[in-house]
Amino acid sequence: MSEPYASSPIFDEQTLPDALRNDHRTKTGTWGLLRVLEGEVRLIFTEPLTEHRVTPDSPAIIPPQATHYVVPVGAMRMQVEFWRERPDPSEGPING
């Protein structure tokens, strides 16, 4: 079983950094897996413009170098895992 090489802290709607609320991207070769532990966030990709609803039952894969940002929908807790290969969201959260 593959594992992430790093994970962000767990953020809530108050502690989510501006860097994640605005356009940003993962580095070359890094996949992100956005896991919502409680509540809901919107994940917006800007190239092309698409929006995904991310919930505890529906994590989201973020491809390498895909420009995106997140928008909390009310109270939430979320974490991002960083992978060297495409993650399998069904493997369950590492932290949380």
Predicted regions and their residues:
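Motif-centric detector for short Cys/His coordination patterns
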Residues: 1-2, 16, 43-44
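Double-stranded beta-helix
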Residues: 3, 7-15, 80-96
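Short loop/turn motifs at secondary-structure junctions and domain boundaries
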Residues: 24-26
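Short, conserved beta-strand element in jelly-roll/cupin
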Residues: 28-43
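Short, charged/polar surface micro-motifs in flexible loops or helix N-caps
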Residues: 38-41, 48-49, 86
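Short acidic-glycine-tyrosine-enriched beta hairpin
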Residues: 48-65
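Ligand-binding loop in jelly-roll beta-barrel domains
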Residues: 64-88
